[in-house]
Amino acid sequence: MKTKEVTPRGDSGEKLARDLLRLVPPQTHKLGTFRASELGRDLRAIVANYAPKTISGHIQIFRDDFIAPPYRQPLYGEFLVHAKTFHPQEPRGTFVFAFSVGDGPECTSVDTIFSPVSLFRVCGLGADAAPHTHRISHIWYESESDFLNVAANVRELIENCSLHKFLSPVGPLVQNIQSTFLNKITTVVKGEVLSNRSPPENIKLVLPSDLFFDMDETCPYPPSGDPVKPRVCYYVCILYVMVNNIPSASLQFFRTGKGASDVVFFLRRYYSDAIANKITVLGDNLDINNLTLGAVCMLGYSSSQSTPGRGNLHFRSYSLPTVEVSDFVAQPGSWTLI
């Protein structure tokens, strides 16, 4: 025999009320999504209608700065360098490299930082390679001994074709706090190139134009039906060459949408004359220690839809033509032998 539980009259009334409420369409709320400020205002009004009356004032979680879309926080690096090794006129956005001598007794707490201009200076190239950079490098860094005091083995590393092993790309410069003896250098090691101030300011990547080329324009792809890549990558290449029978290093920056294997293949063709000249000059002295031709390293990327701009860096009566990339994102890689 089945028994039926008797439902109290109060519970029956509550059930009836719930069933009736389900038939009533839910209350709609108007939200302005055109601007972040309007969205925050409407959300505050809705929450205020349902919040307990004991809460006074606005709901702080829905402030305008909370509604505003965030930016991607870059990773900054700070370095303490000798003032004479980094010129005050080095522009914000110039890509810098940290030189490391290892963990031996010669290692100090003061860092050694190279910009493209100062690195060109210590590589020992002539004016034929990059006339504008050559001229400004001898003005900014008149005395080469300032670098040799903090990086005494640079010449030896170039001769042994191993300079790239001690160079680490540390990103574009965003701040240079100067003093009499030591400077504090801040760079974007990884991420969007933004200033370390509030609000953040976008900083362009700045490179000497006579040290830069577009690989895709120099050696374009054959026509194909492949889709256009959304990014182009920026690289630095160090080539170990012989200049007047003296070991030197050639420095070049370039951008391309090609893959890593295509980049290495093209560089071997692009520098074929310099490579052949080195082998000819060395002759019987060519061995495994100086057989390394060069190395290439990725620095970051930008949109393939953007085109690098042109600029000029003026110093006294001289100017340095530059290439500027407004949407550069720092993402340094490791060195790959050519």
UniProtKB/Swiss-Prot annotation:
* One GO BP annotation of this record: viral capsid assembly
Q: Which domain of life is it from?
A: Viruses
- Principal localization reads virion
Listed GO MF terms: DNA binding
- Where found, per UniProt? Virion; Host nucleus
Report one GO cellular component. Answer: host cell nucleus
Q: Which keywords does the record carry?
A: Capsid protein, Host nucleus, Virion
Q: Which Cys-Cys disulphide bridges does the record give?
A: none
Name the protein family. Belongs to the herpesviridae TRX1 protein family.
Subunit: Interacts with TRX2, MCP and capsid vertex component 2/CVC2.
Q: Which HAMAP family match?
A: HSV_TRX1
Functional description taken from the UniProt entry: Structural component of the T=16 icosahedral capsid. The capsid is composed of pentamers and hexamers of major capsid protein/MCP, which are linked together by heterotrimers called triplexes. These triplexes are formed by a single molecule of triplex protein 1/TRX1 and two copies of triplex protein 2/TRX2. Additionally, TRX1 is required for efficient transport of TRX2 to the nucleus, which is the site of capsid assembly.
Please state what the protein is called. Answer: Triplex capsid protein 1
Species whose genome carries this gene = Equine herpesvirus 2 (strain 86/87) (EHV-2)
Recite the lineage of the species. Answer: Viruses, Duplodnaviria, Heunggongvirae, Peploviricota, Herviviricetes
